[in-house]
A protein has these predicted regions:
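Residues within alpha-helical segments
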Residues: 104, 111, 178-180
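A contiguous, surface-exposed recognition patch within enzymatic or periplasmic domains that forms
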Residues: 40-106, 113-116
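HotDog/MaoC-like acyl-thioester-processing domains
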Residues: 1-62, 139, 144-185
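Hydrophobic beta-strand-centered segment that forms part of the acyl-chain substrate-binding groove
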Residues: 97, 106-144
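Residues that form or immediately flank small-molecule/cofactor binding pockets and catalytic motifs
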Residues: 27, 79, 136
């Protein structure tokens, strides 16, 4: 697991305006805990609790958004050159039936659904957003975002829980989603 944290600052004032925390699970990487003579040992640390992929209550809001079939190509124009998103042979070699939609695009679709359903299309109200990607999304699929109101963390904020399901496959692709909305700016 690699964890990166980055803080974005206003160019003029220097004030922090956003903090980004990115977790990457490096599948099939590792083997650094030993030498060829002494194979690596598994960690004795307890396993993390299982991730909950269901929501017991019916959602307060449901938003369906269709991803564009050409979305992966648009993201490639943004300097993401990972061939997994555009090359069918690379996708198959990695165990996927076809190229994947970028995680950032999936994340953006979930964000859009929350802002549309709960913030009257005012993106300045979004204070935080976190997700767990639980399955791949393919370009052209429909993402259904199911949103539940939660207890507010602080006065003046609105806490939300959500998940995203690909309608065509009935697969949960974002689980354990959390968002916080604030007052309009």
């Amino acid at each position: 697991m690699l964890i990166f944290e980055r803080t974005l600052h206003d160019e003029v004032t220097g004030a922090a305006i956003a903090s980004i925390e990115h977790h990457t699970l490096c599948r099939a990487d590792g083997g650094f805990a030993g030498t060829a003579a002494t194979p690596p040992q598994r960690s004795s640390a307890p396993a993390r609790p299982p991730v909950e992929n269901t929501q017991d209550e019916p959602p307060d809001h449901v938003v369906d958004i269709v991803s564009l079939p050409q979305a992966a190509l648009i993201y490639r124009l943004s300097a993401d050159r990972n061939p997994l998103h555009v090359d069918p042979d690379v996708a198959r070699a990695a165990g996927f039936p076809r190229p994947l939609l970028h995680g950032l695009c999936t994340y953006g679709i979930a964000c859009r659904a929350i802002v549309q359903a709960c913030a009257a299309n005012d993106a300045t109200r979004l204070r935080s957003l976190s997700v767990r990607f639980s399955a791949p999304v393919y370009p052209g699929e429909t993402l259904r975002t199911e949103i539940l109101h939660d207890e507010a963390d602080r006065p003046g904020t609105q806490a939300l829980r959500f998940r995203c399901i690909v309608q065509e496959r009935g697969t949960v692709v974002i689980s354990n989603g959390r968002a916080t909305l604030g007052e309009p700016e």
